[in-house]
Amino acid sequence: DVNVSDYVYMFKKMQFHNHQNLGYEQLPKALSKDYDTESTWMRVPENVVKVYRGLIQVNENTKMVRNNYYEGVCFALKNAARMVTMTEQEDIGVITSANALELAFDTSSDVDIYFYDKYVGGLGFAEKIYDNMEDIIQNAVKLVKGCGCKDGCAACVGDYRLDRQVVLFGPVSY
């Protein structure tokens, strides 16, 4: 069991009839949801942590993180887990441990990826993910490898700026 705190800082404005993106708007006060739910986790291999931390770029002025390949891995694993659990985007969450982006940590410090139910008390999705973890990892590899894009896109790794071969290095290393 885990305690999850979800925050919403902004929202996307869209037209109803064609779903055209009209921009984003910052909320005056963040919306939050705090709940206990079920989860499972997997440890990221040490060699993957070393590579991914070595590629992180931080803009000191804005504190904006670039090249977060953990996000690409989480995106692929979440999509693969959704297929196995027959869930929607809003039913499960996938996130890395807080130390994943901390460059001050030793590159050999453990980084974990957590899968959790987005419902109070959980609905058993995390347990099903645990039971099918090997299949989920293999499906994530197939999703990323099988994409027709050249480098990476919103369909396979979630962000076109991420190199899909580097993202693929994560799940292949399990």
Model-predicted segments: where are they?
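Extended, highly charged accessory segments
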Residues: 1-174
